[in-house]
Amino acid sequence: TTFRNSRKYPGLLRFLIARFFYTDAVNTVIIFMGVYVTDEVGFGTQLASVVMLIAMSFAVVAGFIWGRIVDRIGPKRTLIRVLRLWMIVFAWTALSGFLPVPSWTFWPVPVMAGIALSGTWTADRPYMLRLTPSAKIGEFYGLYGMVGRFAAILGPALWGLIVNTLGLGRPVAVTILLAAILISYAILRPVSDSPRDWSNKGTDSTQPAS
């Protein structure tokens, strides 16, 4: 199967597992950010809309910058930096719910979240390309997409379990998402994005750079 085949290629399976965790966290925070800022931070509906607009605006602008960074330092080092930024975003967001801090202290969060969001998608695909032989791209990108879809389902379900079923609250749910980012970071650290020689795998020996 495709999953078993992925184990033959160094770093690919680790990347896909890590991708599940960070995609789970990112997709979930996108879905529930509006509710969080109104119910936990104390923003009104209009300000919540402004938060989302700020995040999307910075995501668009930062996408061009992240592209240059990927070209310069490579997708792994870029994604590692993006995950560190997500750690700050999730920690800040959780603390905004746990602590009685003024609501204005939350405003840096949508800026950082937008920047991190564009960085995630800008570095994610080139990283996958570095780990996949050209002849196997079609096969493994199906697995790549499946990981993303599964994360998109499980993340909101986990959020609902924590917030609604267990009644632990949204700040706890955000803390769990922070843990998912930390796990993905730890999994990715050993995965090099240096060009591979696939000749001993029976595929092409050249790997396109991102």
Report the location of each language-model feature:
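C-terminal ends and interior cores of transmembrane alpha-helices
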Residues: 84-101
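Juxtamembrane intracellular "pre-TM" segments in multi-pass secondary transporters
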Residues: 1-17, 208-210
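A membrane-interface helix-boundary motif in multi-pass transporters
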Residues: 161-181
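Helix-to-loop junctions at the C-terminal end of transmembrane segments
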Residues: 61-75, 163
